[in-house]
Amino acid sequence: MEGNSGGAAGNDVELLCKTLQVEHKLFYFDLKENPRGRYLKISEKTSATRSTIIVPFTGISWFLDLFNYYVNSDEQELCSKELQLDSKVFYFDIGENRRGRFLKVIV
């Protein structure tokens, strides 16, 4: 995951914060608000790196719908998808390596 909010973090107010640990990775879900509006900040932290994407508030339900598609669909049906929200395009893709399958989200 990669990206940035494009704004000054000093004006941001944290409305909700949740943390999820999956194997050796930590995922942070922060609902925040600044003068431009609300947004969801999703960060993935490993021992060496931290990657972040910002989802505009108006697109959170669309983002979650696509995420659920990958979680609940049969392996054979899965294909790459993209989601345009405001001026951002999110690319969803399934990857696989020696440790297993994963969902890759790129902005």
How would you name each of these model-derived features?
Residues M1-V107:
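Positively charged, low-complexity terminal tracts
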